[in-house]
């Protein structure tokens, strides 16, 4: 299963959001210009993280298969394991959907069990976060694992991370690399050379690449035709 053609055109690697956790707290530089927190503050909403059990039925109510992005961070320390398990159970009970669980705190999900329709991913904005988070992701059972290199704030050398060596006799443990610049009026720059280097690394490992958005001509672009020709890449794992 993959995102719909309409979402493909927009660069979205999901069809529908599932906000099972409201709010979040800063954990690393990627959080500094968080649009969700800015909107919450603008409208006077609380940014304190809390689990939303009233939304557990959302995937059950949709019968048509869809790719769900699980927002916000299921690995947040404010959640206890019972709450995390309830979210995973709701996903397991709706196998017609694919769930993409993205966390900046992958160590908290290491006790999760592998479920065929759940992919686990972690955000990697720079080398320190790659070194810190990817090993935890690799230690977590998952049908597939992915990296969200967005916002990409610095060059990242994946080969420096233990477990990401390219070995002829062992499948590469990452199934997808999503790459993108930061958005918003206070966005920090993403050098296209960093993006190209990551694409080369992914190619060497046989990993599909999904380039979500890039800053071109001073604007954040989402359409492939606005990207440099060699970066018009949106691939999906088989």
Residue ranges, per PLM feature:
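Structural preference for beta-strand elements that scaffold enzyme active sites
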Residues: 65-67, 98-100, 117-121, 144-148, ...
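Acidic, His- and aromatic-enriched active-site or binding-groove loops in soluble protein domains
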Residues: 121-125, 234-237
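Auxiliary Fe-S-binding modules of radical SAM enzymes
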Residues: 1-22, 43, 153, 159-238
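Surface-exposed cleft-lining segments at the edges of enzyme active sites
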Residues: 70-79, 122, 181-188
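Active-site beta-loop-alpha junctions enriched in small/polar residues
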Residues: 73, 104-106, 123-127, 150-154, ...
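Conserved Radical SAM active-site core
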Residues: 1-118, 127-131, 156-171
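A structural motif corresponding to the C-terminal end of an alpha-helix
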Residues: 90-97, 140-143, 198-208
